[in-house]
Amino acid sequence: MRMVSGSDLHGAPDSLIFLTDRVRELKPDRVVLLGDLLYHGPRNPLPGGYGAKGMPDLFRTLMDLAPVTAVRGNCDAEIDCMLVPFPMAESAIIDADGLQIYASHGHHIPEIPPMDGFARGTVFLRGHTHVPRGETIDGFTFWNPGSMTLPKRGYPRSWAVYEDGTFTVKDFEGGTVLSHAVSGNGAGK
């Protein structure tokens, strides 16, 4: 399975256009959007080129290219969710190559084990921190594509592609920010 993920677009059309172009090139089986799609929130600066009003049409273009799974972030108000042309759940379970991937924005789940209620081998795909991540701790795997619009801790704007057990975070110039592989049971390779 090939899956493209992006997070924390915060109303920046250029980020969504970039992601749509990558989806057009890669032809993934699924796109996963990890929340904070339209609004920047009170703790973040207004993104350059902020244009949430035009993003629903861009989301429709993305939906024409691949199935979209979207989860709601802490900055996604109910009115925002009404404008987005696909459902936004609090979380989603994705089966990819024998891995159980739990997708959420990440603001309600701990960053490190223990992970009460989850089996070892679970992969957590999340956004929220605006920081790319790929690591396995105590049998739990944590992936984060970083932020497409407002990266933090000196990281570049980024997105990710999953294929054949490997999660790779890429910057907007095509460079690899990080790569993390897991086996079919969710353990790091």
Task: Write out the residue ranges for each language-model feature.
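Flexible, glycine-rich phosphate/dinucleotide-binding loops
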Residues: 40, 77, 110, 151, ...
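Charged phosphate-binding loop/patch that engages nucleotide di/tri-phosphates or the phosphate backbone
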Residues: 163-189
